[in-house]
Amino acid sequence: VEKLLSLCMIVKDEEETIDRCLSSISGLADEIIIVDTGSTDLTKEIAYKYTEHVFDFKWSNDFSAARNKSLSYATGKWILVLDADEYLNTDDCERFKKFIENEQIEQNKVYSISIISYVGESIRNANVTESTMVRLFPNNQGIHYFRPIHEQVVDANGILLSTTVSPITVYHTGYLKDTVQKKDKHNRNQAIFSELKQSSGFIPYDYFTIGNEYATKGDYKKALYSYERAFKKAAPNNPWILDCASQMFTIYMKFNRVHDAWEILHQVFSHYPDYPEYHAFKGSLYEYAGHYSLAKESLLTAFHNAEALSRKTDRFFLINPSYGSIVPLSRLLKIAKVEQNKEEIVYYCIKILQANSHDFQTLNTLITVLLLKESESAVITTINKIIINQTQRDFILLHKIFLSHGNKEIAKYYENKIENRSLISIEDLLFSSIINSSEQQFKEALLKLQPDNADNPKINLAIMIATLKWQNPFIDMLVYNENQIKAEQQLSMYQKIINNTIAQQDIVQNVTTVHTLLSTLFELKQFDLFDIYIDQLNHPLVISLLANYFYHNFETNLAVSFYNLLLEQNKMDDSGYINLAHLHINSGYSADAVPFLEEAIKLNPNGHHLFSLMLIHADNEDIRKRYRKQYTSLFAQHVKLPFIKQL
């Protein structure tokens, strides 16, 4: 019987991830080929649990050589290439199998898969990026890899192949900080690049991959230099040129080189107006410059173009499917927040959550707005429509969010759905007892404290609030880690608040701690305590932070009253003036926003978007002339942009 799929992998010291990878694919692959380049851990022993085809290969600083060795052992009709730090969602395996069973093999036709990478400290705190890469192709056609690093797939004559999108997604954890450091990937890759430069010199693709290396390390100056060299030397039909231009655009924006970003946008992406990338990039540039109406128009076009194309083809994007979904939707949500448009906030939150129901920040934003305008039963109904087939993980997350909003009824609703109460965190038990006014429940939760709870600052915050609420010295139970100096400072600060002996200088030095305490009291609906301690901890810095907190949480009347206090004392900062300007613009009183924008620019002349807002909303020509001149002197790159010139 002909084997349908051969999985080919090269590995070295992958004992922490290879089992996850192989278990995710073992039900799909008819043959698993493992080429080991020198493991000293249990990698091979784990691999032997899944296959007898484990081969040793002497590492020669050449990924292509190792990859091609693995391909030489494959006997399946199709070849899939994975790395050990990648894995499939097992629910997708049946769809994958149907695809390769039904797909007609054509000469020199290769397939890209979608790779979702987690980048950051850990999966929980990671940023998620999505890219495509050729990993699936028919066997026995001479298709092989070339270049020692960031290897590419070519045909038997060494010619790059055209790529077709496959409906396959894998997940990649190799960019997590611990993995990068442990495997010393950057130094390993640098050594390979050095050898390559000495032996044969660099081709444009090498400069592109070197740029990727620097970008991963966060060295964007060197990354941009490499990307620019690659872009300048490359043929316009190179398959990676769009990725290179995208990276250049992103770094230009990071360096405030907006005109250069505009140029690369139109030089490359304007040729693809039916795809989302052009409009998503343009929308992000408009938003950055403070031109929100143009930004919304472009971002909506990106989203709608992707929707229209996706009904015709799987390949509805040029670089990354997120440019047709999460990227424009997230930016549209951000603008809706600036404009305080609750209907649009709800709409965009729901759209984002339909793609990723575990986006904590977006879910929290949605719930914040829903609780302002909907009954508790209506809120639950909306959540249940978004998060379908809810799991225990969902109940725990929703319980946590509604606790943070001080909504004990809905929090209790989701708590009752949690089957194993031991999964509820100590933090959530403590806050639950506070909003339910149960001192006994709080005491019982305290008994569960463990030394590792010292790394959670919210536990100490809950203990402090309980001390104030019940006038009980729970503060003696504060938990700390090895940072003794910081611990003593926090304890001293809390003691002064409790004893009403706090000085203004103490507040200045600990303003974040004070603001967190007061805003949490408000969130938990401990209004009596809030009123007491806002008087005791009254300081312009605290009032400013609270005013902004109220404004961004749609407590407009409270925000305005706090801003008025600051105006009376002449203590308003630029963020307050900006929020008041937006408040007037959003209410249709653009002329009244101008004085607030003027004050904001005085305090923050580096706020480039403020000048756009001024030129858009000011009617007085003398004012416009003055700020156009200042804008030109401070931001020469900006005023070269066509849409800025027209203001």
Where are the regions a protein language model picked out?
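Generic helix N-cap/helix-start motif at coil->alpha-helix transitions
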Residues: 201-207, 238-245, 273-279, 290, ...
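Acidic helix N-cap motif at the loop->helix transition within catalytic regions
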Residues: 16-19, 41-50
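Short, well-formed alpha-helical segments that are part of the catalytic scaffolds
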Residues: 8-31
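Catalytic-site signature of metal-activated, phosphate-bearing donor transferases
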Residues: 65-71, 82, 89-222
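Short aromatic/hydrophobic "clamp" motif used to bind/position activated sugar donors
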Residues: 79
